[in-house]
Amino acid sequence: MIFHLVPLDDWLRDPDRPYAPASLAEDGFVHCSPDEQTTLAVANAFYRDTVGPLMALLIDEQALDTGVVWEPADPAPPPGVPEATRFPHVYGRINRSAVAGMMEVRRDADGRAVALGPWS
């Protein structure tokens, strides 16, 4: 299982189409994380100012219609993530049938991501 962060509104925008975030057009792949702790570090580094619910998609990489390549962070991983960590990059749109679940990023009073919890 790999994780992908997405604002809830973005995920719900086109429910009948494969998911294609802006990073697919900009970077050529969809950024994902290998585990919950890394996902929280990414949320704190890049999504701290996101307004509204921030979700973590739980993606079954075996069910994807496209390939996943495990690559190092470029230029560096977010704070708290070991330098040697490899990140799963999905080189194509995410078919929604590969999304096995969705969790909400829980934040503290300062907006820091502290846990993943059930979406309510």
Predicted regions and their residues:
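Conserved, structured core segments of small domains
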Residues: 1-120
